[in-house]
């Protein structure tokens, strides 16, 4: 008799949803509308990301969710949340998968914590941001370490670490720091950086 665990069933449903999303280049509003979709376990990733943000920076966080990053930022930082839906607190509502991306107000730093996996055209997004920010701090579950069940997780793209570095470089950004959160990589990119200073990784 065929049986399926709840976890496996949920993964299968998510895989189907992701496949449909990929076919239409749309965001999964149903999933991300609810705050229940944002795990508190992700706060430790936000803490690492915050450590890569320079003090006194104007920061915009895409996929802000519970906005845990806001209280983790270094001294003097201002914070603008952005997400698919209005989370309050001055949220810039923005769907990163829309055909026409909106103008992004100037900020020093853009943050993507567990977001790029859900973007259908990552190169287009980074290119769009290239004149709006000086630094991008982004996590990504690279295929080097995360090959299994990507669609079951809702991820719509499959990029290796070298893919990530190449697409950011094509948009005029150079990596100057890399850290890790579990099997995910966390990168800091600076626009038109000529030299790569030392960075202490965890």
Language-model segment annotations:
Residues 162-178:
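A SAM-dependent methyltransferase catalytic signature shared across enzymes that methylate proteins
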Residues 1-105, 193, 198-201:
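Conserved N-terminal segment of class I S-adenosyl-L-methionine
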Residues 68-71, 88, 119, 144-148, ...:
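Short catalytic/ligand-binding loop motif for oxyanion handling, primarily in non-cytosolic enzymes
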């Amino acid at each position: 008799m065929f049986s399926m665990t709840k976890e496996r069933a949920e993964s299968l449903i998510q895989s189907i949803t992701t496949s449909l999303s990929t076919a239409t280049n749309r965001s999964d509003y149903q999933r991300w509308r609810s705050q229940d979709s944002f795990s508190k376990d992700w706060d430790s990733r936000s803490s690492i990301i915050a450590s890569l943000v320079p003090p006194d920076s104007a920061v915009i966080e895409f996929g802000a969710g519970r906005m845990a990053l806001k209280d983790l930022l270094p001294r003097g930082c201002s914070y603008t949340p952005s997400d698919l839906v209005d989370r309050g607190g001055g949220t810039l509502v923005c769907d990163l998968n829309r055909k026409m991306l909106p103008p992004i107000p100037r900020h020093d730093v853009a943050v993507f914590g567990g977001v790029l996996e859900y973007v259908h055209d990552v190169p287009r997004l980074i290119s769009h941001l290239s004149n709006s920010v000086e630094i991008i701090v982004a996590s990504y579950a690279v295929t080097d370490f995360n090959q299994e069940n990507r669609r079951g997780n809702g991820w719509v793209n499959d990029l290796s670490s070298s893919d990530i570095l190449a697409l950011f470089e094509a948009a005029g950004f150079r990596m100057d720091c890399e850290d890790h959160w579990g099997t995910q990589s966390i990168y800091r990119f600076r626009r038109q950086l000529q030299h790569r200073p030392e960075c202490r990784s965890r």
